[in-house]
Amino acid sequence: MSNNKETPEHLQAQNIIVIHPGSLYLRMGRASDVNPCRLLHAIGRRRKPGGRAYRDRVLSVPIAKPKESLSEFEECRLQVSHTLQSCVQSDGRRRYATPPQQISAFNRRSGAETVQASRVDWKDDLPGDKVFGEEVLWLNPAGEFNVHYPIRRGELNLHKDVGGSMSGVMCDLQDIWEYVLRHRLRIDLKQLKQYKAVLVISDIYNRAHLKELTSLLLNKIGFGCCFLVQDHVSATFGAGLGYACVVDVGDQKTSISCVEDGISHPNTRVRLPYGGADITQTFHWMLQKCSFPYKECDQSRPQDAFLLKQLKEDICHVNLDVCGAQEKTFAVHQPQQEKRRFTLQIGDEAIVAPLGLFHTELLSVTGVNKSTPMTQKPSRAQPHPEDCFDAEYLRETGRRGKENLEQTANESGMANAENADEDMVVEGLEQDREGKVNEKDFILPGGQMIGIDQAVLQSIERCPNDELKRKMYGCILVVGGGMKFTGISNWLQNRVALKIPLMYRSEHNIVTSSKDIDAEITAWKGAAIMSCLESAAELWLTEAEWTRYGLRILREKAVFMW
């Protein structure tokens, strides 16, 4: 009996590297791997003598909370709490809640218990000028290292401070990715010409950024060839679905689009600038309101930020059968301090915080509730001087061609019948064929951003025909690591089901993790599957093609509408 690991397909998959970069984590692995390597998507760089200090934070800086925001937050929190109290458990009994005063009194009495453990120190004595992975979290804030996260809120982290230029961000990405290739995947970088790369990109993309990323893979890191695939398209492959309304909740953004037969419809795409990290900060705010026993917790410290993230993942849920106060223990081990254990009591705050995805007033702690959503810019709004087939180039050359043609016709005295055709071409290009998607459609009166359930409805309503809308209402795929709360998929299903137009109602189903794949790696797994298909042979873009043709070849070979 032959060994499956020796088949040509498996050998080919071993030479394909699938890269899924996120705002918090990077997932990278061979297409033949069951699971990818997961690494903190950050880098520590030793400052040059006299250089400016700069550190990206794990959690965004909380905004100064004016009275209006606090009252808005508190009003929404009370409204959600009353809604939960009016719900019933699965056995038909009414839910009950422990009074907040009782929970606060317990937490105020809860003291720290010292635990015997080995001492933890700052990692200031690391060799070299670069630090990767979890060690970045243990760099002394007063030390010699700057900390950079190259992706924030799903976009390249471009800013005007240290390391915020395009070249700086590309250098960070190159160093992090090459570190994983060398030290996690054990690949000799000199042999990379024998390897292919698949890069999972955001469903809403910037064409100039894609050019830089393709150059990074082929020219700088040195892969033999590559192709790019949108995360929502690869998620449907990973879940084994031919179509779905994909809801991807990451650490710092939530993106939604409708995918059918490997195509993400541009008009249905929207990215909301909130995710799991915003839920973490909302949860911390609620913990403070009920006398969180770890009083010196500071979101700006990486260790405390990850502690809060872990508490959110361990405690938060949307299980209506869990009522009253729950006791949880957690440990705190700061550098150069003793390890301490705390006991925490918490009530419905564990449910209210995740529901911030539906009631964005609860996210006012970070200010994202008043941010502007992002939709896909049409190609005419993203002209590039190297792309001789984009709308801007054709518009300009078409106009010049028309002027030259008119001049020739006038000189010869001939009636130019071709001018009518030329006019049609130019005017057709000047129209926005992709339709207009207004970001304001995702903002409620008063500037409040809509919740995830309303965003799903808005996205599906932008589908081009009724049949596609009906299919999307029947298949909503939830992926990403920011919405992994028990029971939240049922909550989303119920919220959406109440608002589905009668003509589209059918058997309603939300797929959370099809084929037993973790929602966090569904998109990565789908890209790995795509790369091994026979049809993928036409997608690969070689370094020679890229160097010769540039953006033209990406336009021709891209698996998405350029």
UniProtKB/Swiss-Prot annotation:
Gene Ontology CC annotation, any one: nucleus
A Pfam cross-reference name: Actin
One GO molecular-function entry: ATP binding
Gene3D superfamilies per record: 3.30.420.40, Actin, Chain A, domain 4
Binding-site list for ATP: D248, V249, G250, D251
Coarse class of the protein's main subcellular location: nucleus
BP-aspect Gene Ontology terms: chromatin remodeling; DNA recombination; DNA repair; regulation of DNA-templated transcription
Keyword Nucleotide-binding in annotation: yes
Residue pairs linked by disulfide bridges in the UniProt entry: none
Keyword Transcription: yes
Transmembrane regions listed in the UniProt entry: none
Cited InterPro entries: Actin, ATPase_NBD
Record key words, sorted: ATP-binding, DNA damage, DNA recombination, DNA repair, Nucleotide-binding, Nucleus, Transcription, Transcription regulation
Subcellular location: Nucleus
Family to which the UniProt record says this protein belongs: Belongs to the actin family. ARP8 subfamily.
Subunit and partners: Component of the chromatin remodeling Ino80 complex. Exists as monomers and dimers, but the dimer is most probably the biologically relevant form required for stable interactions with histones that exploits the twofold symmetry of the nucleosome core.
Protein purpose: Plays an important role in the functional organization of mitotic chromosomes. Exhibits low basal ATPase activity, and unable to polymerize. Proposed core component of the chromatin remodeling INO80 complex which is involved in transcriptional regulation, DNA replication and probably DNA repair. Strongly prefer nucleosomes and H3-H4 tetramers over H2A-H2B dimers, suggesting it may act as a nucleosome recognition module within the complex.
Name of the protein: Actin-related protein 8
Gene, per the UniProt record: Arp8
